[in-house]
């Protein structure tokens, strides 16, 4: 897997509007990784009083103690900009995420190619089914677990291929030795 030897960040943003000129980022969840090793996590939200949309406010009420809350809607993106400097970003969504993160200099791409999946509305249902994962509000954690599973699967396949190759080599070697000993015994 290409990610095993790279440093990268898996990032999910939840905005107040699908267009960045009409909203702001209400929540950022991100994992900073070196290969498969978790280096750090970034979990920030704006204070509830800054969010006018009650449905959105209710949607992000989970796991309150895990998030750092800020009372300035512009502070979070500045903090993330510093935290993510120099790391490529693997996005969970691209229609609005790139728009909201447009001021960052980081390379950005969707994460799904590393999981041999295509993005779609049901992508997390497919991920949970493919890797036998339990639902979670922390989507970056589901992606991280999926990357680990994918890496393990590729290691298993590589190991099986190596064992198969070694087995074939041993069979060929044994055949040669068997023919040689038959000739010598005549």
Description of each model-found segment:
Residues 85-103, 120-168:
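Acidic, Mg2+-coordinating catalytic module of metal-dependent nucleases/exonucleases
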């Amino acid at each position: 897997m290409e990610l095993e030897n790279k440093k990268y960040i898996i990032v999910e943003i939840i905005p107040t509007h699908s267009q960045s000129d009409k909203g702001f980022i209400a929540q950022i969840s991100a994992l900073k990784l070196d290969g498969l090793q978790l280096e750090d996590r970034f979990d920030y939200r704006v204070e509830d009083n800054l969010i006018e949309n009650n449905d959105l406010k209710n949607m992000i009420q989970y796991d309150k103690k895990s998030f750092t809350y800020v009372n300035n809607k512009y502070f979070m993106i500045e903090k993330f900009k510093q935290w993510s400097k120099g790391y490529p970003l693997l996005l969970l969504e691209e229609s609005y995420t790139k728009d909201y993160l447009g001021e960052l200099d980081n390379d950005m791409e969707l994460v799904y190619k590393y999981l041999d999946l295509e993005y779609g509305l049901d992508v997390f249902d497919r991920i949970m089914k493919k890797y036998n994962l339990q639902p979670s509000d922390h989507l970056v954690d589901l992606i991280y677990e999926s990357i680990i599973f994918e890496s393990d699967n590729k290691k298993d396949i590589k190991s099986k291929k190596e064992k198969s190759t070694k087995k074939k080599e041993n069979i060929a070697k044994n055949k040669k030795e068997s023919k040689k000993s038959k000739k010598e015994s005549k």
